[in-house]
Curated annotation (Swiss-Prot):
Beta-alanine binds at residue 57. This is Pantothenate synthetase. The reaction proceeds by a bi uni uni bi ping pong mechanism. It is found in: Cytoplasm. It catalyses: (R)-pantoate + beta-alanine + ATP = (R)-pantothenate + AMP + diphosphate + H(+). SUPFAM superfamilies: Nucleotidylyl transferase. PANTHER family: CYTIDYLATE KINASE/PANTOATE-BETA-ALANINE LIGASE (PTHR21299), PANTOATE--BETA-ALANINE LIGASE (PTHR21299:SF1). InterPro entries: Cyt_trans-like (IPR004821), Pantoate_ligase (IPR003721), Pantoate_ligase_C (IPR042176), Rossmann-like_a/b/a_fold (IPR014729).
Length: 276
């Protein structure tokens, strides 16, 4: 595995490669990232992993400065997963002039976009830059960040980016908690409460299977997510991947939640296909 910070150096290394699988991350890697790397390794000749804590996707009161970092551990996991090139750009590399950014026109007015204004502009800006640098054949994203994934798919379509976006399943702890770099923030009590998010989503699925109206399911889910010391950011259902309102013609529904614990904000979701 080679570690690089230079755009020119990485482009030269990738020139002429038949297929390149790419996983963009902010580091502090876990088993969820490892599953993306494993799939990329199986499907491509070359695997590129980027680690960059992107400042433009953090709001003024968010956790940019304390976002967990562990370069040595990340490098070990990347090496074990068979990564060929680990791209470690600096802010100056990624934002040399910072004169232009991507702006999201739709799909950021629901779910995380409501409480994190500008977040997805930052995400799509950095993803756009990384796609231009790496020029991958395939890029891998986890469904845990389902809204982000849908917006990236939309960006790729709107901008005619020649990359195949691969949706990858959510990887969970044994008790159902979705793997996340931010789980490390949780106190012991919060860690015991957190699996209740997935439990609430599974109860919602069972209710939908039984024919319970969607609005009733959302109300029931909100009621089941009232953990001590937490606030509910949202419990919403949107059509997927359009992120528009659910109506009678909607085949796939994204049921998504965000819960603010004292130590961390956790998100989770499920995709529900009507009639499946």
């Amino acid at each position: 595995m080679k570690i690089m910070q230079s755009v020119t150096q990485l482009r030269e290394a990738l020139a002429g490669q038949t297929s390149v699988g790419f996983i963009p991350t902010m580091g502090f890697l876990h088993e969820g990232h490892a599953s993306l790397l494993e799939q990329a390794r199986q499907e491509n000749d070359i695997v590129v992993l980027s680690i960059f804590v992107n400042p433009t996707q953090f709001g003024p009161n968010e956790d940019l400065d304390r976002y967990p970092r562990d370069e040595q551990r990340d490098q070990q996991l990347a090496q074990a997963a068979g990564v060929d090139y680990l791209f470690y750009p600096t802010n100056d590399v990624m934002y040399p002039l910072d004169m232009a950014r991507v702006t999201v026109r739709s799909g950021d007015d629901v779910l995380c976009g409501t409480s994190r204004p500008g977040h997805f502009d930052g995400v799509l800006t950095v993803v756009s830059k990384l796609f231009n640098i790496v020029q991958p054949t395939r890029a891998y994203f986890g469904l845990k960040d389902a809204q982000q994934l849908a917006l990236i798919e939309g960006y790729v379509t709107d901008y005619f980016v020649p990359v195949e976006i691969k949706r990858c399943p959510i990887i969970r702890e044994a008790d159902g908690l979705a793997k996340s770099s931010r789980n490390v923030y949780l106190s012991e009590t919060e860690r015991k409460q957190a699996p209740g998010i997935q439990q609430a989503l599974q109860q919602a699925k069972q209710a939908l299977d039984a024919g319970t109206p969607l609005e009733t399911v959302l109300e029931q889910t909100r009621a089941s997510l009232h953990f001590e010391g937490t606030t509910i950011d949202y419990v919403e259902a949107v059509a997927y991947p359009t992120l528009g309102p659910v109506d009678a013609t909607t085949d796939t529904i994204l049921l998504a939640v965000a819960v603010q614990f004292e130590s961390a904000r956790l998100i989770d979701n499920l995709l529900y296909t009507r009639g499946a």
